[in-house]
Amino acid sequence: MGKSILLINGPNLNLLGTREPHVYGHTTLSDVESNSREIAASHGAVLESFQSNHEGAIVDRIQAARGKVDGIIINPGAYTHTSVAIRDALLSVDVPFIELHVSNVHAREPWRHHSYFSDKAAGIIVGLGVYGYKVAVEHVCVNFEEKEKGAKAAL
């Protein structure tokens, strides 16, 4: 059976394509999810996506992933800067994760510069627009393939 990836998007990412397009672009979350599933499938992996504006729902979904997914890609949105609960959930399931941000959070308001996830993430993708999702999925899939060959991989 192929590897399994969980793609999680946090608050306001359901508005991709319409919310501040000068910052986030015009591609919708539905397009991002569909493209991500296609990329994963091209590597023999399955990608499931989940989006919520609610911290507890994200925690619940991460906990439900324990033992069922091989990698997580998460764009925590504004929870990046506030959520110890999501951080703790990610650490509790023992699944490597990639932290992803569409915008360059380090070039924005100073309060956006701190992340509760970066120090525990297997990798961080910042400021590549929605192309960052492609990079994240490709990275996770290539690392799955490298691990199957016995090579040391980051995820």
Swiss-Prot record:
Gene3D superfamilies with a match to the protein in the record: Dehydroquinase, class II (3.40.50.9100)
Pathway listed: Aromatic compound metabolism; 3,4-dihydroxybenzoate biosynthesis; 3,4-dihydroxybenzoate from 3-dehydroquinate: step 1/2
SUPFAM superfamilies to which the protein is assigned, alphabetical: Type II 3-dehydroquinate dehydratase
Record's catalysed reaction(s): 3-dehydroquinate = 3-dehydroshikimate + H2O
Active site: 24, 101
GO biological process: 3,4-dihydroxybenzoate biosynthetic process; quinate catabolic process
InterPro entries: DHquinase_II (IPR001874), DHquinase_II_CS (IPR018509), DHquinase_II_sf (IPR036441)
Domain of life from the UniProt record: Eukaryota
GO molecular function, one term: 3-dehydroquinate dehydratase activity
Residues the record lists as binding substrate: 75, 81, 88, 102-103, 112
Enzyme class name: lyase
EC number(s) reported in the record: 4.2.1.10
Keywords carried by this UniProt record: Lyase, Quinate metabolism
Transition state stabilizer, annotated site positions: 19
UniProt function note: Is involved in the catabolism of quinate. Allows the utilization of quinate as carbon source via the beta-ketoadipate pathway.
Family indicated by similarity: Belongs to the type-II 3-dehydroquinase family.
Subunit comment: Homododecamer. Adopts a ring-like structure, composed of an arrangement of two hexameric rings stacked on top of one another.
Protein's recorded name: Catabolic 3-dehydroquinase
Lineage: Eukaryota, Fungi, Dikarya, Ascomycota, Pezizomycotina
Gene name tied to this protein: qutE
